[in-house]
Design a protein with these regions (language model features):
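A generic, lipid-embedded transmembrane alpha helix
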Residues: 51-71, 127-131
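Short aromatic-rich membrane-water interface segments that cap or initiate transmembrane helices
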Residues: 48-51, 83-92, 144-154, 269
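Alpha-helical transmembrane segments
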Residues: 2-35, 62-75, 81-84, 88, ...
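Juxtamembrane helix-capping/reentrant segments at transmembrane boundaries
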Residues: 39-53, 228-233
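Transmembrane alpha-helix boundary signature
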Residues: 65-82, 102-113, 131-143, 252
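Function-critical hydrophobic alpha-helical transmembrane segments in multi-pass membrane proteins
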Residues: 155-165, 177-178
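Hydrophobic alpha-helical hairpins/lids featuring a short glycine-rich hinge
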Residues: 82-124, 129
Length: 371
């Protein structure tokens, strides 16, 4: 017989999708009435004005869905053995931090906010998680490092939260890419949290996934000329990145014997977002090498590179999502058999080879165009 908690999680997904489907058309209507558009320019891929407030639905819908369903679940007396007893402080910190990033992202979408101010808010939001007890206490043997002192682990966690949040924000450059990668990550994280019987965290994954699904269809299949297309905007990417970073860090530090996945929780958690994490390192390195401001946008991301190889936007989105799935499968197969440091080394080697292949393709295309 299926346990009530699994039915509850399925209901949560349906409710989240349904509420998002009801909210998104209204945001779209308001965006067009108020002319709240992301205008095309030489750096951007789209060629028509598109509303950038799709992410406006993310945090409120998640809050309503998760809060409402948890209340109903407890009123029905179903809390025993599933979500009962889990400490709420980390969720309160997540709530406040998500609200902060949602608001600064919304302000950036509407009037523009400088990157320095956004970084400051991200650091404060990340510090809230650390203050609630969610911080990386061990590297699980990465580079031979295990336990971290609070003086190292706490600031390191703040850095990781800011890193993950911005990685998702920066990869949001073509239709369906950021939302697709986040959806893949959330499915994987939800699965592992369910396996570990951490149902409150699985619920968070599933409600976030439920919001992303209808947005993804608007973003990928919507017609901008007919007013049926959305972009995520910073209100969506920043709050979503923050929530995913929270889930990844929590999974990296949890100890729930006998369901524990040994020292490889961190590997699995960060593998789910490996493509954006590796891409932002390469992009920042490229900008510094060319003496450019690493915080200002350009066209050096992986999706720009694939577009220059001749792929269409949707093909690029599918290719990068498949690459993310490949990393997840590869690392999952290596877990328990390969040292964590070697896993990271293999991932980086695969990433480098992938870009070397793209460079060869680009060089060949340029040579053909010069003939």
């Amino acid at each position: 017989m299926i346990q009530p908690i699994y039915i509850f999680l399925l209901v949560a997904l349906v409710v989240s999708v349904t509420i998002a489907m009801l909210v998104l058309p209204n945001i779209l209507l308001i965006s067009h009435k108020k002319k709240l558009f992301d205008m095309p320019d030489k750096r951007k891929v789209h060629h028509a004005p598109v509303p950038r407030l799709g992410g406006l639905s993310f945090f409120p819908v998640m809050l309503i869905t998760m809060g409402g369903l948890v209340l109903i679940y407890h009123l029905m007396g179903l809390s025993s053995g599933s979500m009962h007893g889990e400490v709420p402080y980390e969720f309160l910190a997540l709530l406040v931090g998500s609200m902060m990033l949602f608001l600064v992202g919304l302000a950036d979408d509407l009037i523009g906010v400088g990157y320095k101010k956004k970084f400051l808010v991200q650091i404060v939001a990340a510090s809230l998680l650390v203050a609630s007890g969610v911080w990386i206490k061990s590297l699980d043997g990465l580079f031979g490092i295990y336990q971290l002192s609070p003086w190292v682990g706490m600031p390191f966690t703040v850095l990781i939260v800011v890193y993950v949040t911005n990685a998702i924000n920066l990869i949001d450059g073509i239709d369906g890419l950021a939302s697709g990668l986040c959806a893949i990550s959330l499915v994987a994280l939800a699965g592992l949290h369910i396996w570990l019987h951490l149902f409150s965290f699985a619920l968070l994954c599933i409600t976030a996934l439920g919001v992303i699904i209808p947005f993804w269809f608007y973003n990928v299949f919507g017609n901008a000329m007919r007013g049926r297309k959305f972009f995520m905007g910073d209100s969506g990417s920043l709050s979503l990145g923050y929530i995913i970073s929270f889930l990844m860090i929590h999974l990296s530090t949890v100890d729930v014997s006998p369901h524990v996945v040994s020292d490889y929780n961190m590997v699995f958690a960060f593998t789910t977002m490996l493509v954006p994490l590796l891409d932002v390192v390469r992009v920042v390195g490229h900008r510094l090498r060319n003496r450019q401001n690493p915080f200002l946008p350009d066209k050096s991301h992986i999706h720009h590179k694939l577009l220059r190889c001749g792929l269409r936007v949707r093909q690029v989105m599918v290719a990068i999502c498949l690459l993310s799935l490949m990393f997840i499968l590869l690392n999952f197969l290596m877990i328990g058999h390969v040292n964590i440091t070697y896993i990271l080394g293999i991932d980086i080697a695969v990433w480098i080879v992938f870009h070397l292949v793209l460079d060869v393709i680009l060089h060949t295309r340029r040579a053909e165009m010069d003939i």
